[in-house]
Amino acid sequence: QRLEEGGVIQRRVALVDPHKINLAVTVFVAVRTNQHSDEWFQGFAEAVSDMPEVVEFYRMSGDIDYLLRVMVPDIDAYDQLYKRLIERVDLFDVSSSFAMERIKLTTALPVDYAD
């Protein structure tokens, strides 16, 4: 309870088997843009936030500007998501990689580094 009060534990969740809820396809979407204004980013972030299929969203260093992890039932569902995204936001390049097999997935964090 102290960990919750101290903000260490943010929330409690149930871990759901994605196959049991028809989300068998994981897609990693690398996005590059030539626009970096706050206004553009706000529109992009809003578009991504409106898509429940996007389960993670990161701003990256290196060649990729943003990385999304998307979970969908099939490739057609991803294609529909992709079309909705590019309809709302001007993107320079979108590269999608489909996960063939999940080797490791954990939400447990290494607590050895905690103060």
Q: What is each model feature region?
A:
Residues 1-115:
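A compositional/biophysical signature of low hydrophobicity enriched in polar/charged and small residues
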